[in-house]
Design a protein with these regions (language model features):
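N-terminal pre-domains immediately preceding structured catalytic cores
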Residues: 1-175
Length: 175
């Protein structure tokens, strides 16, 4: 969880004292019928798994949707982006008028909610408005804080991003 000084926007090291050790990136036993490469989001336990096969998975700690913003079902990665522009959906602007100033898009950077890497979830060719994104706020890992998107520490998200091609299946379990 060290610094990433060579990124377009240098990413600071993670203060690991702000993360429960159980949420640190790890390889674990994980029995599933899903094929290797599948991403499984477990919002109840604040984990994202990347199935590796042979009963193993890479497990990442995550933040998830707060009460009333959780969803579940199957999706797939329809798009990937490094240092994306963030545009709040109309529904978010209605709930949080202070984000209206970003209706035309928020420039990439460390303050951008989508961070350094984002995987966009699609169903039937349509963007669901949900993402797997990177965060530089370790204190949010293991909590329900978002409007339904799933956040991983930047270093973890970069690892997952690099291993995940467009078209990868994503299974979001019930909370």
């Amino acid at each position: 969880y060290g610094p990433l000084p060579d990124e377009r926007f240098p990413v600071p090291a993670v203060n690991v004292n702000k993360i429960n050790p159980k949420y640190r990136h790890n390889t674990v036993r994980y029995d599933t019928r899903e094929v290797a490469g599948t991403i499984i989001v477990d919002p109840r336990n604040y984990y994202v798994y990347r199935v590796e096969g042979d009963g193993m998975a890479t497990r990442y700690g995550a933040n998830v949707g707060r009460a009333g913003f959780l969803w579940n079902g199957d999706a797939y990665i329809g798009r990937k982006a490094e240092w994306p522009v963030w545009t709040p959906p109309r529904e978010m602007i209605a709930r949080q008028p202070e984000v209206a100033k970003y209706a035309g898009g928020m420039a990439p950077g460390l303050d951008n909610p989508l961070g350094a890497r984002t995987l966009y979830l699609y169903q039937d060719g349509v963007y669901t408005l949900y993402t797997l994104y990177s965060t530089i706020m370790p204190e949010t890992i293991g909590k329900g804080v978002t409007s339904g998107c799933v956040g991983l520490l930047t270093q973890d998200m970069m690892d997952l991003y690099d291993k995940t091609p467009v078209g990868t299946k994503v299974v979001v379990l019930k909370a």
